[in-house]
Regions:
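Amphipathic alpha-helical linker/stalk segments
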Residues: 1-13, 28-32, 54
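Short, hydrophobic secondary-structure boundary micro-motifs
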Residues: 28-32, 40, 120-122
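Short, charged helix-capping/linker segments at alpha-helix termini
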Residues: 66-70
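Short, charged, surface-exposed loops that flank catalytic or proteolytic processing sites
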Residues: 5, 96-101
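C-terminal effector-binding regulatory domain of bacterial HTH transcription factors
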Residues: 116-131
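Amphipathic alpha-helical packing segments from all-alpha helical-bundle domains
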Residues: 11-15, 19-20, 38-63, 73-88, ...
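Secondary-structure edge/capping motif, primarily at the C-terminal ends of alpha-helices
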Residues: 1, 28-35, 61-62, 86, ...
Length: 131
């Protein structure tokens, strides 16, 4: 995910995780649902490394687009959480196929990032405040 256009990076990252789920199902189950005796929280460690890398890439993109780089860690957590939780769901479902799931997850991530506001705020409840 180090090179290429931003959307392609997202797609490759999502496909990589789903391919791991598909090809190393037992390993993913161990990582996602527990750990081997005597070992630490392996899945958490892997996700933390992935999140750090994604956050670093997002900081670059945010700087390029004039967004707050300090928030890249939050968005990295959100993106990795979206992808990893969807992978857990797909582990049990396996329908739709991997490429369809990856396309939909990438669509959500890409279009959500593409339309980001520089100063987001909560709109829910504003009508109640005005009343």
């Amino acid at each position: 995910i180090q090179e290429g256009r931003w959307r392609e990076r997202i797609e490759r990252g999502v496909l990589a995780l789903l391919t791991y789920v598909e090809e190393e199902t037992d390993g993913f189950i161990i990582l996602a649902h527990g750990q081997l005796p005597g070992q630490g929280r392996t899945y958490s460690t892997i996700l933390n490394r992935v999140t750090a890398e994604v956050s670093h890439l997002l900081a670059e993109a945010f700087k390029h687009r004039g967004l707050d780089e300090a928030m890249a860690g939050l968005y990295g957590q959100a993106l990795v959480g979206t992808v990893s939780n969807s992978a857990l769901w797909w582990l049990d479902e396996r329908v739709p196929d991997k490429h369809t799931v990856a396309a939909h997850i990438s669509n959500l991530c890409w279009n959500g990032l593409r339309g980001m506001e520089a100063q987001p705020r909560i709109y829910a409840g504003e009508a109640e405040k005005e009343a």
